[in-house]
Amino acid sequence: QPSKDAFIGLM
């Protein structure tokens, strides 16, 4: 489950 990847992705 990508949680931090999603946060870094939108950054």
From Swiss-Prot:
Segments forming a coiled coil: none
InterPro entries on file: Tachy_Neuro_lke_CS
Location within or outside the cell: Secreted
Keyword Secreted: yes
One GO BP annotation of this record: neuropeptide signaling pathway
Main location: secreted
Modified residues (Methionine amide): 11
Modified residues (Pyrrolidone carboxylic acid): 1
Protein family per UniProt: Belongs to the tachykinin family.
Functional description taken from the UniProt entry: Tachykinins are active peptides which excite neurons, evoke behavioral responses, are potent vasodilators and secretagogues, and contract (directly or indirectly) many smooth muscles.
Protein name: Eledoisin
Organism for this UniProt entry: Eledone cirrhosa (Curled octopus)
